[in-house]
Amino acid sequence: ARTFAELLDAPLAIIEKRRIGNSDRAELMNVIGEVKGRRAIIVDDEIDTAGTLMETVRALEREGVTEIYACATHGVLSDPAIERIRASSLREVVLTDSIPLPAEKRLPQITTLSVAPLIGEAIRRIHRGESVGALFSSEVSFTQEMLLWEDGIAKTLDMRGVPIETPARP
């Protein structure tokens, strides 16, 4: 979340929460930071049942946030996550395809980004004896370009897998 805030030149707010016992259930405590009248991006490692996500959405709405987006690396999306997301005010939920999303769980609100370019670049770096860790250093991981081979032609892709137009090399 801190890296996103820095890249977007936006303030960071934190939702304080604590786990209840040894369960997966979390209790939200406080919104730390000024969020009234702002757009919020909730950043988490995974969304399972979306219970904590929905509590976070409600807390942000109470604090006067105008639009809410969420992103997570892993979309487990166990029941009742899909119904919770569908019924929520979330504008968009961005996930990676680290866990396949079955057709019945696809919603217009959910955007899935491929991790294939990242994995491909990690494999290329391992093969060439280059640093894999550098892929995950704060700003580099969001702006890293990758050189991939397709049909014998080098293609440069951004981290979303979108081709980047590059000038011809002499």
Predicted regions located by residue number:
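PRPP-associated nucleotide enzymes
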Residues: 1-170
